[in-house]
A protein has these predicted regions:
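Walker A (P-loop) ATP-phosphate-binding motif of ABC ATPase nucleotide-binding domains
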Residues: 19
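Glycine-rich phosphate-binding loop used to anchor ATP phosphates in small-molecule kinases
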Residues: 67-109
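Conserved lysine of the Walker
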Residues: 30
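Hydrophobic anchor at the beta1->P-loop junction of P-loop NTPases
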Residues: 22
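The conserved Walker
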Residues: 26
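A glycine- and Lys/Arg-enriched "phosphate-lid" helix/loop adjacent to the NTP-binding pocket
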Residues: 106-153
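NTP-dependent small-molecule kinase module
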Residues: 5-11, 15, 40, 144-189
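Conserved substrate/cofactor phosphate-moiety recognition/catalytic segment
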Residues: 35-79
Length: 189
C-alpha cells in the first residue's frame, strides 16, 4: 500500500500480536515512529544500530551472522515488538515473523532536515557535541543513500519492500502522531 500524498495515515488491520519492522534512510523518522509505538504499546523496541555495530567502538561492524542471530532471537523471544533501522539485511531477518513492514521514504531534503534537528541520542554518543561532530558525515551518508549500492541503499530497501508478501506500508511523508490518527491507535490494539 502506498500512503503518499495528503497527511499520511497508518491504515492497518488489527493484530493479536503487534510486530512492526520499520526501514528507511537516516532521518526518515524511523526512531520517532518506533519510540511512539513502543511507548504506547509496551512492546520492546530494537534499534538495529545497537545490533549492527560493536558497542563502545566507532564504526566497527558486528559480524553479520551474529547480528542476524540477535534479530532472530529478539523476534522469537517477544510476542510483540518494534524494530527499526537502516539495514535491509537485518530487517529481512525479522520478516519470517510476519511483521507489518513500514518503509519510510520521505525524500532526501526531509531526511537532511530531520538529521539537522535530531536530539541527542545518548545510546549512540557520549554527548550532543560528539553527535554533532559526526553530522557532516551523516548528511553525506543521507545524500548518497539514493545512489549507492549495498544493504543500506534505497535500492535495497525498495527491493526488500517489494519482495515482502506480508502486510506492508510505504510512506512518502511522516505519519501523523500528534494527535494520533484513529488508524494508528487501532494498530496498537
Amino acid at each position: 500500500m502506498n500512503s503518499g500524498g495528503s497527511p499520511l495515515r497508518l491504515i492497518v488491520r488489527r493484530h493479536e500480536r503487534m510486530r512492526i519492522a520499520i526501514l528507511g534512510n537516516s532521518g526518515s523518522g524511523k526512531s520517532t515512529l518506533a519510540r511512539w509505538l513502543g511507548d504506547r504499546s509496551g512492546a520492546p523496541l530494537l534499534d538495529l544500530d545497537t545490533v549492527a555495530w560493536e558497542p563502545n567502538k566507532v564504526a566497527v561492524a558486528t559480524a553479520e551472522d551474529a547480528s542476524v542471530s540477535y534479530v532472530s532471537a529478539f523476534c522469537t523471544s517477544n510476542t510483540s515488538w518494534v524494530l527499526e533501522g537502516c539495514y535491509a539485511n537485518l530487517t529481512r531477518a525479522a520478516l519470517p515473523f510476519m511483521p507489518i513492514l513500514v518503509f519510510l521514504d520521505p525524500g532526501e531534503e526531509r531526511c537532511i532536515s530531520n538529521c539537522r534537528s535530531r536530539p541527542w541520542e545518548p545510546h549512540k554518543y557520549a554527548s550532543k557535541a560528539a553527535q554533532d561532530e559526526r553530522l557532516p558525515f551523516l548528511l553525506t551518508w543521507v545524500r548518497e543513500y539514493y545512489v549507492r549500492g549495498g544493504e543500506m541503499s534505497h535500492s535495497s530497501y525498495a527491493a526488500t519492500y517489494a519482495a515482502y508478501v506480508g502486510p506492508k506500508y510505504l510512506f512518502t511523508r511522516a505519519p501523523v502522531l500528534d494527535p494520533p490518527q484513529a488508524e494508528i491507535l487501532a494498530w496498537l490494539s
